[in-house]
Amino acid sequence: MSVLTPLLLRGLAGSARRLPVPRAQIHSKPPREQLGTMDVAIGITSCFLCFLLPAGWVLSHLESYKKRE
């Protein structure tokens, strides 16, 4: 690395610090209807079945994937 590299990096970082950072104005309304216990249970169960179950099956059968037959 050159001797000038730290000076260049410091110069770039200094000018980047002065730039304004745009902030998102996110506002949310209250929900139209509250979720019930059954709705939450169905949502969590479907997430488990769709994402975690296939991943668990693949991980449990990883040794059979490694073997070449």
UniProtKB/Swiss-Prot annotation:
Function recorded in the entry: Component of the cytochrome c oxidase, the last enzyme in the mitochondrial electron transport chain which drives oxidative phosphorylation. The respiratory chain contains 3 multisubunit complexes succinate dehydrogenase (complex II, CII), ubiquinol-cytochrome c oxidoreductase (cytochrome b-c1 complex, complex III, CIII) and cytochrome c oxidase (complex IV, CIV), that cooperate to transfer electrons derived from NADH and succinate to molecular oxygen, creating an electrochemical gradient over the inner membrane that drives transmembrane transport and the ATP synthase.
GO biological process entries: mitochondrial electron transport, cytochrome c to oxygen
Keyword Glycosyltransferase: no
Span(s) of short sequence motif SIFI-degron: 2-19
Superkingdom: Eukaryota
Name of protein: Cytochrome c oxidase subunit 8A, mitochondrial
Organism for this UniProt entry: Carlito syrichta (Philippine tarsier)
Quaternary data: Component of the cytochrome c oxidase (complex IV, CIV), a multisubunit enzyme composed of 14 subunits. The complex is composed of a catalytic core of 3 subunits MT-CO1, MT-CO2 and MT-CO3, encoded in the mitochondrial DNA, and 11 supernumerary subunits COX4I, COX5A, COX5B, COX6A, COX6B, COX6C, COX7A, COX7B, COX7C, COX8 and NDUFA4, which are encoded in the nuclear genome.
